[in-house]
Every structure is written in structure tokens, then in C-alpha cells.
Design a protein with these regions (language model features):
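Transmembrane helix-loop-helix hairpins in multi-pass inner-membrane proteins
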Residues: 1-13, 64-177
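A short amphipathic helical element positioned immediately N-terminal to and/or at the very start
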Residues: 9-17, 85, 192-204
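Membrane-interface helix starts
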Residues: 17-26, 201-216
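Alpha-helical transmembrane segments of multi-pass integral membrane proteins
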Residues: 26-33, 64-71, 106, 216-220
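Membrane-embedded helical hairpins/re-entrant loop segments and their flanking transmembrane helices
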Residues: 38-62
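Core segments of transmembrane alpha-helices
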Residues: 107-111, 192, 217-228
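Short, membrane-interfacial amphipathic segments enriched in basic
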Residues: 176-196
């Protein structure tokens, strides 16, 4: 996907034109970015009683970025991470909470950085982005909206039950699911939400780890900005 439609000679010429130290630094920062997410997953998973070690959690991060890169709209990353975490003996509910908190931290950092630039460097942004400044505001708004929705799902797991029941009724009407299995499916959702809520409460008892996850996410996000420099 990276090299589709590109000429290998031009790519190689661009790579050779780079300074060795700059190229090595960019590669190191790229690896740091991915490994940092694995570290954050380990910190949160440990608080939720997960079994996976640091290297295994880093492998979840690499797996997530890989499948995000090859699936439409980057939708395949977290499902594959959840699958691997479950296969390694971690509970689905705890793993789901960990991945959602990781996503919230990532989005929240983007919102904070975007809002900071808008407040203190708004004129520079307008001059630099020109006609694309509206897209910047749209992106900031969408990231904020997603952050609020996911945070709501973490704090108010009842939303999951309401949403799952709504989708269940919709799929039954579309004849994608059998109506006879609705009771069983709803019971599974309720059991999942109970475990999910216990994992959320457990994380709330470890505010230090949540703060560490946010700070590490801030460092991780800014390391990506340094790569382009």
C-alpha cells in the first residue's frame, strides 16, 4: 500500500538523499511510537488484572497498527488486538476497557494539542492552513465528539445495553438474525456489561495509572511530530 503507484527508483533516491542520522532517528522514533502504545496497554491491563507482559502488549500494538493500515478506515486494528488479548487469557471485558481507555487518551491528547494551538496560535494556523482551516476545526470537533462518546460508554456502560438491544431489533427486522435468539443475545450482553463495569471500577481505583497513560500518550503523540522535523 505504501509503494502503490510509486516508482522504486524515486523512492530509493529520496532515501539516499537523507542523512544517515536523520533516517536512523526517524526509524527509532517510529518504533518508539508503536512501543509506547504497548507500554500504555501494559500499564492499564496490569491495573485491570490482565496477564500479558510488556513485550506481549507491545506485540498487540504492532498488530493493531498493521491491521489498521490494511483495513478500510483503519477499522481492523482494535478487533485484532482484542482477539489476541482474549487468546492470551485476558478477559474480553477488561481488554475492551483497556483499549477504549487507550483510545480516549489518544483522542484527548489530540484535542488538547489542537485546542492549545487554536487558542494560542490561531492566527498562525489561519495563515498556514488558508482555506483548509475549516477542516482543522471540523477535525477538532469530531475528535472531541468521539472522545465524549467513548468516555460516556466507559462511565455509563448502560449505553452499551441500549445500543446492543437497538442493533438486535434492527438486525431481526432486516432478517439478519433470528428473533428466537434475542433473549440469549441480550443476556450475553448483560453479562458482558457486568464484567465490563467491574473492570471500569477497578481502573478507577488506580488513578495514578490513568494519569501515567495520559502523560505517556502525550509523549507518544509528540514523538510522531518530531519524525517529520
Amino acid at each position: 500500500f505504501c509503494f502503490s503507484g510509486q516508482k522504486p527508483q524515486e523512492i530509493w533516491a529520496a532515501v539516499k538523499s537523507m542523512r544517515g542520522m536523520s533516517l536512523a532517528g526517524a526509524v527509532a522514533l517510529g518504533l518508539f511510537f508503536v512501543c509506547m502504545e504497548g507500554t500504555i496497554i501494559r500499564i492499564l491491563l496490569g491495573a485491570a488484572g490482565g496477564k500479558s507482559g510488556l513485550l506481549t502488549c507491545i506485540s498487540y500494538s504492532f498488530l493493531g497498527f498493521f491491521y489498521s493500515g490494511i483495513t478500510p478506515s483503519a477499522t481492523g486494528g482494535q478487533p485484532m488486538q482484542l482477539y489476541e488479548m482474549k487468546r492470551d487469557g485476558n478477559s474480553v471485558s477488561s481488554s475492551t476497557v483497556v483499549l477504549m481507555v487507550t483510545a480516549v487518551c489518544y483522542k484527548l491528547v489530540l484535542v488538547c494539542i489542537g485546542a492549545f494551538l487554536l487558542i494560542f496560535q490561531g492566527e498562525m494556523l489561519r495563515q498556514y492552513l488558508g482555506g483548509y482551516f475549516g477542516l482543522y476545526l471540523l477535525g477538532l470537533f469530531l475528535n472531541l465528539a468521539i472522545t465524549l462518546v467513548v468516555t460516556g460508554m466507559i462511565v455509563l456502560p448502560q449505553w452499551i445495553i441500549v445500543g446492543a438491544n437497538a442493533f438486535d431489533r434492527l438486525f431481526v427486522k432486516l432478517h439478519l438474525w433470528k428473533a428466537s435468539g434475542s433473549v440469549g443475545r441480550q443476556e450475553k450482553v448483560r453479562c458482558f456489561v457486568q464484567e465490563y463495569h467491574r473492570a471500569v471500577l477497578f481502573l478507577k481505583e488506580h488513578p495514578g495509572r490513568l494519569a501515567a497513560a495520559f502523560l505517556l500518550t502525550f509523549v507518544q503523540r509528540n514523538s510522531a511530530f518530531v519524525i517529520t522535523w
